[in-house]
Regions:
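Fe-S-dependent hydro-lyases/dehydratases of central metabolism
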Residues: 1-258
């Protein structure tokens, strides 16, 4: 049977993460952002057609994917969030197709410096790199997290072997990641916010021209967002499968309370 999740209960990926994921499990989902790797679950978003095959007992057959290590070191600076880390990685690998149809495996000493919800925020955005799936090594943070939704038995330690071979590696020093923004028309079109503010007119004009070359009908107007030399923000949204994490909602609540 099915499980009905009311809209006021959870963002659906947060619900699946909390209630269905587990270390060493695999989940096939219809949504492209099906990613629960931070809890040791290989989750793949394949679309409704593939899911329908599962409902009638068919197998899910794929060739062995390549595996790329995402080697994390350091610790994020204050104010740098999971979306900043994710966008930095997406911006580095997307155009080159470096992780396309591969598994991104997050390892390294920097993993221990990230709370689980922080890892979730990075993990769910790996879809935008065109990777097939993503998985993280698990640790004490993972073990401490799973009893919160009432599933301590879902924990298993997952780590690379002492000698592990990969098809590639992306080295990320978390201490160097800056607050980052993605501009239209794809999350790979990234800039450090400091760079965008310093060169707002040039960057937004280039982005506007590229975007309008891709769309028909109403044209994108970014230049009007520059007011008095600053960039005007119309709306702040904390939601969705990446931004709508519990930690993010709490952080925004704290900011609004002053």
């Amino acid at each position: 049977g099915g499980i009905y999740v009311p809209t006021n209960m959870a963002v659906i990926h947060s619900y699946n993460r909390e209630m269905m994921s587990g270390c060493g499990r695999m989940i096939l989902g219809s949504d492209s952002h099906t990613r629960y790797g931070a809890l040791g679950t290989l989750a793949v978003g394949e679309g409704g057609g593939e899911l329908a095959k599962q409902l009638v007992g068919r197998t899910y057959d794929v060739a062995r994917p390549g595996v790329v290590a995402i080697y994390l070191t350091g610790k994020p600076r204050d104010g740098v969030g999971p979306q900043d880390v994710a966008l930095s990685i997406i911006g580095a690998v997307y155009a080159k197709g470096y992780v396309k149809n591969k598994v991104m495996e997050f390892v390294g000493p920097g993993v221990a410096n990230l709370p689980i919800e922080y890892r979730n925020g990075i993990d769910v955005m790996t879809t935008e790199t065109t990777c097939w799936s993503s998985i993280w090594e698990t640790d004490q943070n993972t073990k401490d997290y799973l009893p919160i939704p009432g599933r301590p038995e879902a924990f298993k330690p997952l780590k690379p072997a002492e000698v592990a071979y990969y098809d590639g590696c992306v080295y990320v020093d978390l201490s160097t990641v800056e607050c980052t923004i993605a501009l239209p028309m794809h999350p790979s079109y990234t800039y450090a916010i400091s760079e965008l503010k310093a060169n707002a007119a040039d960057i937004l004009h280039e982005c506007q021209e590229k975007a309008n070359a891709q769309i028909t009908g109403a044209k994108l107007d970014l230049m009007s967002k520059i007011r008095g030399g600053e960039i005007w923000v119309d709306q702040g949204l904390v939601a969705g499968c990446s931004g709508g994490t519990f930690d993010n909602v709490c952080a925004v609540a704290d900011i609004l309370r002053g």
